[in-house]
């Protein structure tokens, strides 16, 4: 947009082009991997940081961004501390906001019995994006990546997509 240009610079429609690092046309890469999970319980939190780090190593990307998202509407990917008391607090908090029973509480449950799981996923989020620097995830000291399952005991997938150079 012309209004977004810096003073003294002019926007020429059609002049913007995607650029790759270094101008050699081959600097930007992308990598895609699916992680599959099947939990033993209906609701479960699983630390997937090591699996995501393995995807990053396999990608060979040193600088960029990593997207990790749950590919199912009743599961979540989020970042937090790996502490069992905190996980119990999540469970209590989410159950207070969207209790599993009675199933009649949710209009959605006329078709299925997982209306609560849809709400829990909405609260905890679909994905995380993490900066990649020097081939490492830029996570804080206690930050870990988690898969949150709210309607489990069946096979579900998480997508890891990495872009960078």
Question: Can you name each region flagged by the protein language model?
Answer:
Residues 1-165:
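Active-site histidine-anchored catalytic micro-motif
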